[in-house]
Amino acid sequence: MMSQTAKVLLLYAHPESQDSVANRVLLKPALQLPNVTVHDLYAHYPDFFIDISHEQALLRDHDVIVFQFPLYTYSCPALLKEWFDRVLSRGFASGVGGNQLAGKYWRCVITTGEPETAYRPDGFNRYALSDILRPFELTAAMCRMHWMTPLIIYWARRQSLSELASHGRAYERWLADPLTPGGF
């Protein structure tokens, strides 16, 4: 197992970040942690032209990769999908010789616009969020990464500021020590 001071790369992908109170609350403490690198994909790549070698270098330099994004149409925002397709290339993350991410950890941190009850067979979305997120889990497996249980903030816009602050504190504790069993 890795040391408790694991280096965390937090890849943040929100096309309307200025409107997301929940994500701002989650990100604020992460920016202060010495072991966490926050990388805002929409701020870095507003034109969607991703610097693949830079992104791959960031991945190589970190132990835990966190993908923080809002759930959009049962998936991630478009830039993050483009990032997956371009950065997690064969020969780097998968395929012959593609073992650069093997043994690292993958965690999704997701905000939704609906309550948890919407994500079940009798709910509005008809499927559990774990089913909807299966492509991310499969991508982590393809990269030989350890899949960590996603952190989900359901109905993020309807959470009170005190509820969001509580999530933010728990998230900060987890980011500071992400490989301790029983963490957030």
Curated annotation (Swiss-Prot):
The UniProt record lists the keyword Repeat: no
Catalytic activity: a quinone + NADH + H(+) = a quinol + NAD(+); a quinone + NADPH + H(+) = a quinol + NADP(+)
Localisation per UniProt entry: Cell inner membrane
UniProt main location, coarse: membrane
Record-level GO cellular component terms: plasma membrane
Membrane topology: Peripheral membrane protein
Enzyme Commission no: 1.6.5.2
Keywords: Cell inner membrane, Cell membrane, Membrane, NAD, Oxidoreductase
GO molecular function terms attached to this record: electron transfer activity; FMN binding; NADH:ubiquinone reductase (non-electrogenic) activity; NADPH dehydrogenase (quinone) activity
GO biological process: positive regulation of potassium ion transmembrane transport; potassium ion transport
Keyword S-adenosyl-L-methionine tagged: no
Similarity comment: family membership: Belongs to the NAD(P)H dehydrogenase (quinone) family. KefG subfamily.
Function: Regulatory subunit of a potassium efflux system that confers protection against electrophiles. Required for full activity of KefB.
Assembly: Interacts with KefB.
Protein name from the UniProt record: Glutathione-regulated potassium-efflux system ancillary protein KefG
Organism: Cronobacter sakazakii (strain ATCC BAA-894) (Enterobacter sakazakii)
